């Protein structure tokens, strides 16, 4: 019988879906195990017969399923207002160009967010964050991008920092100043990119407000040359990069981001084989965002089979935002990725655990249940991981553990 050291906490009588690729079973499943936690990290995973049955720091989970904490690696969580009215207009036949001419589209969210007090933005974002936490999310990426000016971009990143300070969920903040051209630069997008590169990135990086730089390389966003200026600026400062690419057309954005060893290429509906090969060579994760595909009623699906063939890691995220994916649910995104894009449930699980961790540069500490990894995990009233993917409207979460503490 193994003796527990003082300060150790044990979860026993569990079915572990470790998501460890070194384990042969689907989902890295192992039965009749015990998880030993100390100081916020997993010390060991051992057969439960090696440990005492009961004690002050022993939690008997009665055979429940345990998985790594979920990771939502692509969200636009901090914003004000909503775009419900323009969604109704679109369904009644209005074009995006018509809506934009009336002040709608992303600029409507930018205007509302610029005008919103920081404390109000914080309260709005906190409610959304806790919704994701209630689904078992323990690591969350938050992008800026609804300021499109230095002061408001900084305000959004300060909100993300305030959320992180609550110590309820890990936050990975991303600067997405190159999200769209603001109205005041409508006729000078190159001038706006100069502002992003010469002012926003260096000043906000110096303040320690973000972990990575993102951009929107698209026909309705920024072209390849403008996008490369952003990537060059970030890389010169040693900042990891990522990109919204190939969502609505094939511009070569995935190849561009991969050339800069981007953490991830996101959306990728129009990705071609050359882009997939570049992602493999650049170590870039493909992030699927089925909520936007569904909400925009797109028809071009990401090349999932090509990604499999080239062994490119595939993550899945909510893309929660007011304009194209108003779905604050990672469970729903997992289901959509299977139904719409043809992922298997196991691939969807990998997409919100170990591959999502890689998309945030956290693969050495998050996304798997292994000795030395962070003790972020979820106990479910379920027998199999597929149950969480199969029925997204039902949340069988029993217990969420963050940094070794029940939360």
Curated annotation (Swiss-Prot):
Protein's cellular compartments: Cytoplasm
GO biological process, one term: L-histidine catabolic process to glutamate and formate
Pathway: Amino-acid degradation; L-histidine degradation into L-glutamate; N-formimidoyl-L-glutamate from L-histidine: step 3/3
Any one annotated GO CC term: cytoplasm
Keywords noted in UniProt: Cytoplasm, Histidine metabolism, Hydrolase, Iron, Metal-binding, Zinc
InterPro entries associated with the record: Amidohydro-rel (IPR006680), HutI (IPR005920), Metal-dep_hydrolase_composite (IPR011059), Metal_Hydrolase (IPR032466)
Residues annotated to bind Zn(2+): 74, 76, 244, 319
Binding site for 4-imidazolone-5-propanoate: 83, 146, 179, 247, 324
EC number: 3.5.2.7
Cofactor notes: Binds 1 zinc or iron ion per subunit.
Disulfide bridge map: none
Gene3D superfamilies: Metal-dependent hydrolases, Urease, subunit C, domain 1
Name of protein: Imidazolonepropionase
Organism, as annotated: Salmonella paratyphi C (strain RKS4594)
Organism lineage: Bacteria, Pseudomonadati, Pseudomonadota, Gammaproteobacteria, Enterobacterales
Originating gene: hutI
């Amino acid at each position: 019988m193994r003796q527990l050291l003082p300060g150790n906490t044990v979860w026993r009588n569990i079915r572990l879906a470790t998501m460890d690729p070194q384990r042969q079973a689907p989902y890295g499943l192992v039965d009749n195990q015990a998880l030993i936690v100390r100081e916020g990290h997993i010390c060991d995973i051992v057969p439960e017969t090696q440990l005492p049955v009961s004690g002050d720091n022993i939690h008997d989970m009665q055979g429940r399923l345990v998985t790594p904490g979920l990771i939502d690696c692509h969200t636009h969580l901090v914003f004000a207002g909503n775009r419900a009215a323009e969604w109704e207009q679109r369904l009644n036949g209005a074009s995006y160009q018509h809506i934009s001419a009336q002040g709608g589209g992303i600029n409507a969210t930018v205007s509302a967010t610029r005008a919103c007090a920081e404390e109000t933005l914080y309260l709005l974002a906190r409610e959304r964050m806790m919704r994701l936490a209630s689904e078992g999310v323990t690591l969350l990426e938050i992008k800026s991008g609804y300021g499109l000016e230095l002061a408001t971009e900084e305000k959004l990143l300060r909100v993300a920092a305030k959320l992180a300070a609550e110590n309820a969920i890990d936050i990975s903040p991303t600067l997405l100043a190159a999200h769209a051209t603001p109205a005041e630069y409508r006729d000078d997008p190159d001038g706006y990119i100069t502002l992003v590169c010469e002012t926003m990135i260096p000043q906000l990086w110096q303040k320690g407000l973000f972990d990575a730089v993102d951009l929107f390389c698209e026909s309705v966003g920024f072209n390849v040359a403008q996008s490369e200026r952003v990537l060059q600026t970030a890389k010169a400062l040693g900042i990891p990069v990522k990109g919204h690419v190939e969502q609505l057309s094939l511009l070569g954005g995935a190849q561009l981001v991969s050339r800069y060893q981007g953490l991830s290429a996101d959306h990728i509906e129009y990705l071609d084989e050359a882009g997939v090969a570049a992602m493999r060579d650049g170590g870039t994760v493909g992030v699927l965002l089925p909520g936007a595909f569904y909400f925009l009623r797109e028809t071009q699906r990401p090349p999932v089979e090509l990604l499999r063939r080239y062994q490119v890691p595939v993550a899945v995220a909510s893309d929660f935002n007011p304009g194209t994916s108003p779905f604050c649910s990672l469970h729903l995104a997992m289901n959509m990725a299977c139904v719409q894009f043809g992922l298997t449930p196991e691939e969807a699980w990998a997409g919100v655990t170990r591959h999502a961790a890689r998309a945030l540069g956290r693969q050495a500490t998050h996304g798997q249940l292994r000795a030395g990894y962070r003790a972020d995990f979820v106990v479910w009233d379920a027998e199999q991981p597929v149950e969480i993917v199969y029925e997204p409207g039902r949340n069988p979460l029993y217990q969420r553990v963050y940094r070794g503490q029940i939360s």
